């Protein structure tokens, strides 16, 4: 399995353009054609999260007679899941849609 394939797996069920995956890989200094390994898990997660965050700002798109829309809460849930699975607590907290209770002093 290639890193590109692992990223696509993380993004499922969201379909994104290969150029977006390539750009995110370049930004994170990883080659999409390299073999995926346990050592690459963290960077693949970061690349996947970056792409999903881009989809949040997009929320919907249309092209040549078809349109797509994205459920922002579901995107945030996916980001949170990937972040928690890879130990990125700060990212998980930022995108966690569950209500939070704060104790005021």
Residue ranges with predicted function:
Residues 1-43, 90-105:
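Conserved short "hinge" loops at termini or chain/domain junctions
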Residues 42-57:
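Short, hydrophobic/amphipathic alpha-helical patches that form generic packing surfaces
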Residues 16, 53-105:
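Short loop/turn elements at secondary-structure junctions
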Residues 10, 24, 50, 78, ...:
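Residues that form generic nucleotide/phosphate-binding pockets
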């Amino acid at each position: 399995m290639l890193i590109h394939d692992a990223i696509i797996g993380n993004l499922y069920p969201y379909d994104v353009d290969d150029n977006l995956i390539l750009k995110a890989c370049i930004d994170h200094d990883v080659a999409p054609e390299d073999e995926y390994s346990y050592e690459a898990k963290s960077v693949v997660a970061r690349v996947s999260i970056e792409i999903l965050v881009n989809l949040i700002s997009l929320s919907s798109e249309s092209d040549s007679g078809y349109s797509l829309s994205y459920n922002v809460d579901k995107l945030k849930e996916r980001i949170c899941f990937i972040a928690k699975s890879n130990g990125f607590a700060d990212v998980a907290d930022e995108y966690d849609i569950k209500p939070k209770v704060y104790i005021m002093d």
